[in-house]
Amino acid sequence: MLKGGIRAAFAACAVAFAFVMNADARELPRPETFTLRNGLQVVVITDRRAPVVTHMVWYRVGAADEPRGVSGIAHFFEHLMFKGTRQIAPGEFSRTVARNGGDDNAFTSWDYTAYYERIARDRLELVMQMEADRMRNLRFSDETFASERDVIAEERRQRIDNSPGAVLGERMRAMLWPHHPYGTPIIGWLHEINALDRETALEFYRTWYAPNNAILVVAGDVDAAELRPLVERHYGRLRPTRDLPERNWVQDPPSVGPMRVSHRDVKVRQPSMSRMYRAISYATDEGRQAHALDVAIDVLGGSETSRLYRALVEEQRIAVSAGASANTGGRGGGSVSVYATPVEGVSLERLEAAIDEVIAEFLGDGPTEAELARAKSSMSAAAIYSRDSQESLANIYGASLAQGESIDDVVNWPRDIEAVTREEALEMARQTLVLDSSVTGWLLPEDGQ
């Protein structure tokens, strides 16, 4: 399962962080944490409501860490990690979890790769033993590797190549980040997937899949005192990677002008347009810049009360949908997306011009105090009514730490959102919504509009 942006299931940091925030909440629950001698960071989120636990291992490696020419190798391990060790037969990992009443899965972003199990508390040690085993002892044959490579190539054909919107989005990202690895698709380019080999995969695994490059997050019916002996027993003996590589990614120079791309496909029935801007993220900002950007973009296009929706859908009636979103969770930066679909008979030229007018007006006067308050409230409410569960907190803390943030950053997020001023939101909107730092994409039927 590919994750972009988590925040990812979230991957938008703002939406994920806002979980459990309400009118009185000013911070998120603070977990217990400790670090083993081999470098494994452990985060424990106690929740005694049910005898259930969520066990997650987050590796600080994702698609952005792949060497040039081997795109898709990070995602490849979502498949390979289930192919067995000396102790566990191929496919037996998930079957064992299921036989014990649990479920498991994995996901990849540009910044991390994560594996999780949700299971009864009295089965925690079982999944911990299996997860620790495959951290360092994975085994797969040339035949297994080749078979999974074919599976992933077909996955790409179905999810990307057969989806006009996904193809356009992939092209837009490649233009927005021509050198930065965020411009490379998580699943990889097809010709590079087909060229992947077992030895390259093993070297990637031996380097990055190590306790000193991992975060163990356990949420549920357990506390640190109960958990630590189990962690020491199963993870404490694993050897760390010596000289773990620095995650130094190539940076893009400033854009010199707006970029455009269009994609035509016989499968497109309804034209649409979208635009992506480069942006800061929680890992790259200073002070409350990312918080302010999240609030600003929510005012601009985060809901049916937003500027874009009201102007284009309700007032001018030229769009069936319109909005904007901020992906501020990336370790290496973020992005803002603006998008709309016209009503029948309205051209994309007219729709784009109307979007530009709304944005220009927003950058001129900024959010009102009422809009600011509504945005903060909606960010809170959307999270409160979403997944009020231990998995949500495990995802929030795991993704945040893997992307370079701290526990304090997570705990204080609601308070920092509440503190965003109108002036801060406007300043970040003006810094970000710059055409020279954008790519505009049109999705069109094969025969045009």
Residue map of PLM features:
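Bacterial N-terminal signal peptides
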Residues: A9-V20
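Short pre-active-site segment immediately N-terminal to the catalytic Zn-binding motif
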Residues: G62-V70
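M16/insulysin-pitrilysin zinc metalloprotease superfamily fold
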Residues: G84-Q87, R118-R149, R228, E304, ...
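Non-catalytic beta-strand/loop surface segments
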Residues: M21-A63, A89-R123, R159-N213, R237-A283, ...
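N-terminal secretory signal peptides that target proteins for export/translocation
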Residues: M1-G5
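Active-site SXXK
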Residues: S71-T85
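Non-catalytic, conformational "gating/processing" segments within enzyme and secreted inhibitor domains
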Residues: R149, L202-H234, S437
